[in-house]
Amino acid sequence: MDGVKVETFIKSEENRAMPLIGGGSASGGTPLPGGGVGMGAGASATLSVELCLVCGDRASGRHYGAISCEGCKGFFKRSIRKQLGYQCRGAMNCEVTKHHRNRCQFCRLQKCLASGMRSDSVQHERKPIVDRKEGIIAAAGSSSTSGGGNGSSTYLSGKSGYQQGRGKGHSVKAESAATPPVHSAPATAFNLNENIFPMGLNFAELTQTLMFATQQQQQQQQQHQQSGSYSPDIPKADPEDDEDDSMDNSSTLCLQLLANSASNNNSQHLNFNAGEVPTALPTTSTMGLIQSSLDMRVIHKGLQILQPIQNQLERNGNLSVKPECDSEAEDSGTEDAVDAELEHMELDFECGGNRSGGSDFAINEAVFEQDLLTDVQCAFHVQPPTLVHSYLNIHYVCETGSRIIFLTIHTLRKVPVFEQLEAHTQVKLLRGVWPALMAIALAQCQGQLSVPTIIGQFIQSTRQLADIDKIEPLKISKMANLTRTLHDFVQELQSLDVTDMEFGLLRLILLFNPTLLQQRKERSLRGYVRRVQLYALSSLRRQGGIGGGEERFNVLVARLLPLSSLDAEAMEELFFANLVGQMQMDALIPFILMTSNTSGL
């Protein structure tokens, strides 16, 4: 009996020294297969056993921030320390249970992270990850407030400091992936379809990426301002273009950083190398997916602009074309004569090479003592090309555009205030406003031409280019906006019943634009151009008094404002794509001026 008592006493002492399992009491007991703990003979209560949040096996305690078993603890530790990357052969929703946890290591690691296991706890079990996230965001915020060129360096230095504190081989991506709460149920926490932030990023990564993109953009703007201050002689670009470029650069930088984070946090390949996060290039597939989605959005918006116009043209499809369009009479052969003369003409883009620049320009006051235009100079009669089958509409548009631009320049050369200018000044003014002049001519001769056919061909050409993958989406958007602007402008002037004299004055107001002459040596020439523009405005005001007073004048001038946004490249693409080829309209304008003199147009 004494030996039995001693043996019983030793066993009770050993059980007292063992760690409690499942919240058992300090009294002796033996674990039972059912999951409970057998208490003493007098105890009737049975305490429940905690289960692993990952696989559902019996948990041995809280490991790396989550209640888990020894198997999942060891698996998570090996994956983090060895920086292992897994791939799922299924749909990334494999079952992770006690008996099937070894089938898919990828889904098992994902469920470990979703259950609350922290990768930084593998190295530093007593330092929570929340403090480090706040430290990284605070470091990035301090670098943004400091400004200057050290914004990105402060961000990177702060990031490297935290990496050194964690030790080698630690991963920011694996660290920030453990976002769900610890006490959430496994079925609710592990749901791959509930991604709040884009591309699988969490709040900390998204905040860091956007903040770093802002810092980089501010740094680029400061460098651009500093470089611009040292070169005052360089002509500055349009402020609106600079603003658009900066917005595009900022968007591109932000997309690249987001793609870096997405590629490093790819759900199919976990990357635990934190040193490659700020310098790794985005994968081709990720950047291609982002860029293609943005391109489709731009193209879709551009095509949406054209849809109401196309619907209106279809409703008005019964509009009859003027008899001139159906006649089989050939044109006068003016363009053929021009082409024949261009073959024997020396290519002189400066129109005689007179480069006085307006510094010694003498104003002839006699032109201001008479009317700017006469009824003959305001008349605009274009001979329309033959309108045949619908599949030849593109040739109709090209031929119409060429006749309009030739007739516009020929009409302007008869105006005395335009004849006073030197040849290179005439070219400079025409190059700046020729898209707006074509819009004026299209609205003036809408009774002679089939304007619905032209607008309909613009819509068809834009839709055809939208189906080509190599065409830039911005080009599609410009063409769609230009089509809408031309359509609205023609419709508005048609409702106002504008006279030929008013059309001629509007043409002079657009052409004599002093903002096109910004060089210092063109000061006297700029004053002359401003006087002509003011004289044309006063003449238009008097014309408006005849037809409707001050209100009509204000309406006509307001209709000119959208014409300043017409894009020259888009206008060339819509009107002259099949006619001039690779030669731009800026290069053709000097030839048209010379041929209008030599051929007697």
UniProtKB/Swiss-Prot annotation:
ZnF NR C4-type: positions: 52-72, 88-107
Induction annotation: By 20-hydroxyecdysone (20HE) 106 hours after egg laying.
Domain NR LBD: 329-596
Positions in coiled-coil regions: none
Chief localisation class: nucleus
Any single GO CC term annotated in Swiss-Prot or TrEMBL for this entry: nucleus
Low complexity: bias regions: 215-226
CDD domains with a match to the protein in the record: NR_DBD_TR2_like (cd06967), NR_LBD_TR2_like (cd06952)
Cell compartments where the protein resides: Nucleus
A molecular-function term among this protein's GO annotations: RNA polymerase II cis-regulatory region sequence-specific DNA binding
Superkingdom in the source lineage: Eukaryota
DNA-binding region per UniProt: 49-124
Residues bearing PTM Phosphoserine: 327
Keywords: DNA-binding, Metal-binding, Nucleus, Phosphoprotein, Receptor, Transcription, Transcription regulation, Zinc, Zinc-finger
Keyword ATP-binding included in the entry's annotation: no
Assembly: Homodimer.
Similarity section: Belongs to the nuclear hormone receptor family. NR2 subfamily.
Protein name: Nuclear hormone receptor HR78
